Regions:
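Short, low-complexity, intrinsically disordered N-terminal peptides in bacterial proteins
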Residues: 1-9, 270-275
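Internal, active-site/partner-interface "lid" segment
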Residues: 251-275
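HTH-adjacent hinge/linker in prokaryotic transcriptional regulators
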Residues: 3-38, 42-118
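Glycine-rich phosphate-binding loops that contact phosphosugars or nucleotide phosphates
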Residues: 124-240, 245-249
């Protein structure tokens, strides 16, 4: 019988077959799946008050060869975007800053400057720009739209709360650009959206991370989101958004600067922004 995928699923499936001591170990693992990636069998035995043999037997009943295989599964879950701790740095802020810096440096090394300029030019001269983001990609898309709308008009963010997407994609023309932000843990419909855009006359600019396989798009740029914490980091995607928006503004020359000035004046007239 094939064991269920995650550690918690395996525990739930095997719970009634476990003895009292084994349930003590399994209960600890179920309550602290993040920590489970940190401990070997001896440490788990110490923390649960059972023997090392009991810990080993528990893992076997859960379908693992041993504690290391369970830790490997947790690391794989983290690679799929699930929040699982894989290390325990003494200085979490320093560890995260180091990881973020590495992700941004990777972005700088791997981004095709000519392609970025071409994509930025297309965004600058498009009739309208539609910025599309799902789940964790939505706040990144929102920040991109916020930057672009200060540089040029007719920039829409979709889907808004309560919206469906179909009506937003109808009527796109060859002089429109759709910017899609698709980061790890994308919705199941994500590939369908890209295929629909591939058949549309508009052009598609995809901002993704390396976990996404080959996809149809006129331009694609990847930003790593690996993290020192249990959750993905968006330092590199946000750096990519900033670089893209900056190139768009630069490509608009005087028109972009004039719009920025007009937006700034509107903020002042409305008293919307503080210092």
């Amino acid at each position: 019988v094939t064991a269920p995928g995650t550690l918690v699923e395996r525990i739930d499936a095997a719970w009634t077959a476990l003895g009292p001591q084994e349930q003590r170990v399994a209960g600890f693992l179920r309550a602290r799946p993040d920590e489970s990636a940190l401990y070997n069998a001896a440490e788990l035995a110490r923390r649960t008050g059972v023997s090392k043999a009991t810990v080993s037997r528990t893992f076997q009943r859960l379908g693992f060869a041993g504690a290391q295989e369970a830790r490997d599964l947790l690391r794989a879950q983290r690679g799929a975007g699930l929040p699982v701790v894989v290390d325990d740095p003494d200085d979490a802020v320093a560890a995260q800053a180091s990881r973020d810096a590495a992700n941004v440096q990777r972005l700088a090394a791997e981004t095709d400057r000519a392609a970025l300029d071409a994509a930025a030019h297309a965004v600058a001269v498009a009739r309208q720009v539609v910025v599309l983001g799902f789940r964790s990609g939505f706040p990144v898309a929102m920040l991109l739209r916020q930057a672009l709308v200060q540089a040029r008009p007719d920039v829409r963010l979709v889907p808004e709360h309560g919206q469906t997407l179909g009506e937003e994609l109808v009527g796109l023309g060859a002089d429109d650009v759709v910017v899609v932000v698709g980061l790890r843990r994308r919705p199941a419909s994500f590939d369908d959206v890209l295929r629909a855009l591939d058949t549309a006359p508009s052009r598609t600019l995809l901002l993704a991370d390396p976990s996404l396989g080959p996809t149809p798009a006129d331009w694609r740029f990847d930003a790593a989101i690996e993290s020192a914490s249990p959750f993905d980091s968006y330092a590199a995607p946000l750096a990519l958004v900033s670089a893209l928006a900056g190139r768009v503004l630069a490509g608009l020359d005087g028109a972009g600067a004039a719009r920025v000035a007009a937006v700034r004046a509107a903020y002042a007239d409305l008293g919307e922004l503080g210092a």
